[in-house]
C-alpha cells in the first residue's frame, strides 16, 4: 500500500456492486473500506458493538432504527451507531466510506450525538499557536481522535503504539515517516505501522482525524 492514498483508490466504485475490503488494522477493532455502486443498498442490520462510519466519496442515505430514519451522509461526515441499533444504507450516485466496529466497551466524547451525522472538521477548532486534540471515541485497544494544528505547529518525530490511519480533513501537512517526507492534503489518507517513526508539520492550518488500533 502507498503511504499516501485515498479510500476511493483502495476501494473504487463499481456499477451495480457493493464491495468491502479489510483494512487489516487488527482484530480488536474491525476496520473495513466499503464502496457501493449507484442505485445500490445495504439492508438494515445491527451489530452488537458500536459502529463508526466516515464518508470518503459520494453521497448516501443511512437508515437508522426501527423507523428507518433517513440521515444524509457525504464526504468528511461521521456517523456513530450504538450497538443493537438497526442500520442500513442506500445510494443513488455511488459512495465510498470507512466502517469501524469497536468490539469492546468504549468512552465517547459528550459532544458526540449517536445516530446523528456530524462533519468531522467542524467538531474541533483551531487554537492560536497550538495543537488541539479531541477524543471522539476510545477504549484500551483503540482511539479515534481529531487534531487541529494552527499555522507553524507540528508534532516532533515519535513512534506509534499501534497501526494507524490519518484522515486529512482540512488544509495540508508534511508527514515525516521513517526518514521520508510526504505531502498530505484534505481528502487524503496516510497509513503508518506500529512503532513507525513519524512526525506531522502543518503547512498553514491543518485538521485531521487519527484512528489508532493498539494490539
What are these model-derived regions, one by one?
Residues 1-30, 74-75, 94-96, 101-141:
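A short, N-terminal "cap"/entry segment at the start of jelly-roll beta-barrel domains
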Residues 1-85:
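Ordered, small/hydrophobic-rich secondary-structure cores
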Residues 16-19, 30-47, 129-132, 143-160, ...:
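Conserved short histidine dyad/triad with adjacent acidic residue
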Residues 35, 46-62, 147-150, 159-174:
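Short, conserved beta-strand element in jelly-roll/cupin
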Residues 56-57, 93, 169-170, 185-186, ...:
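A cytosolic small-molecule/anion-sensing beta-strand core signal
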Residues 67-83, 178-195:
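Short acidic-glycine-tyrosine-enriched beta hairpin
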Residues 83-107, 194-215:
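Ligand-binding loop in jelly-roll beta-barrel domains
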Residues 112-170, 178-179:
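Conserved small-residue-rich
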